[in-house]
């Protein structure tokens, strides 16, 4: 399936333009630091742009009960995705799309702010924590890896975290459908 790239964005955003819009869906989160049981959650993600060379990003999650109804808010994160200009003088890879370097800045209401770096290659984005800053009252989050991808027109993502003394391990994943 071809990526739905848009041309009404700055050139540096075109490789990420398939993310633009509102996505909704559900996923599962679980980590030893949060107890043994997995929690189903609903999620809304919005990627936007205002004509400058970055994407705005907001994600909101809610716990879901067995019937799929929302029960309580879980998390909100907001930030900016900053693709770096591609050096078109460098030869393109023999296979696959040219990688786009990314810087992602995220803030959480729990007192955590992080900078992630990584690459986008066509419909796949891989990010890793570069810097994590926490307030004195924030939980002990020290690192994270994120993977985003488009599969069958849906946005899938997975998050691994190092949290409260536990090494990096799977924390959450979801499948989201574009709604606008």
Curated annotation (Swiss-Prot):
- Motif GXWXGXG per record, residues: 21-27
Where does the secretion signal sit in this chain? none
- Mention any Pfam family matching this sequence: THAP4_heme-bd
Please give the family membership noted in the entry: Belongs to the nitrobindin family.
Q: What is the name attached to this protein's record?
A: Ferric nitrobindin-like protein
What organism, scientifically named, is this protein from?
Answer: Kineococcus radiotolerans (strain ATCC BAA-149 / DSM 14245 / SRS30216)
